């Protein structure tokens, strides 16, 4: 075989040029106009791997399918979910939560802390129902001689607490230092020296006696006016003088007495009229619940609280 034949037997690769492969744009990625590769490197959308740590500012994006076209980058907003890794802040709602309802009576009573014990001695002389209010109003006056201070107390029927205390006038004396009434103590010293009975009539009465006396005060008073030269007239009952003072509008002194019968709380006060000094006015408070004691032998004469024996 000659050299020509050997040349013909060797395949000639360059004799037939293969057809060029068709070039088409990549269906997976197209550089949008106006963007550079550096812009895509900084974009968080390219780092979809779960091994990459989330950014504290951008968060994490789950793996998703991105659609592109020749005009640019198309992103399906429904497929992208933003997850914030920071814990949510729970702020108290100022609108949805109902406001707590305030108890007006309790707030007023607790803030003012009203109490009837103010250090002075009072005597209740009346009570009535005020128009426009369901709570009763009680009236008190100071028991100190020649003190005209009064007060009215409104008490809640529901809770039994004092809602309002209104004072009228001012005290012209210091507060009592003990539980004894100042007026009764002074009168007791005078009576002990004159009557010599040795009893301390200045002590406070028990709670039961005080309540019974207030109930008797609510009963209608009986006023008897007669003309006499003596101050105390004999009505059949026995009395003990426990006080005397000058009241407003009458220069003649008023004397106070109480029945000496055990368990009887009837009281009376005697004074001469301002217009007619010969006229004696006797006012009874309460009713006797016992019979008239047996009269003593001989004429009975009570003058200025003294009993003839």
From Swiss-Prot:
The gene is WRKY26. Residues 197-210 have a biased composition (Basic and acidic residues). It is found in: Nucleus. Its main location: nucleus. This is Probable WRKY transcription factor 26. The keyword Translocase does not apply. GO terms for molecular function: DNA-binding transcription factor activity; metal ion binding; sequence-specific DNA binding. Keywords: DNA-binding, Metal-binding, Nucleus, Repeat, Stress response, Transcription, Transcription regulation, Zinc. Transcription factor. Interacts specifically with the W box (5'-(T)TGAC[CT]-3'), a frequently occurring elicitor-responsive cis-acting element. Functions with WRKY25 and WRKY33 as positive regulator of plant thermotolerance by partially participating in ethylene-response signal transduction pathway. Interacts with VQ10. GO terms for biological process: cellular heat acclimation; cellular response to heat. The keyword Membrane does not apply. Residues 111-176, 228-293 bind DNA. Residues 175-196 have a biased composition (Polar residues). Belongs to the WRKY group I family. InterPro entries: WRKY_dom, WRKY_dom_sf, WRKY_plant. It comes from Arabidopsis thaliana. Induction: By salicylic acid. Induced by heat stress. One of its GO terms (cellular component) is nucleus. Zn(2+) binds at residues 142, 147, 171, 173, 259, 264, 288, 290. SUPFAM superfamilies: WRKY DNA-binding domain. PANTHER family: WRKY TRANSCRIPTION FACTOR 26-RELATED, WRKY TRANSCRIPTION FACTOR PROTEIN 1-RELATED. SMART domains: WRKY.
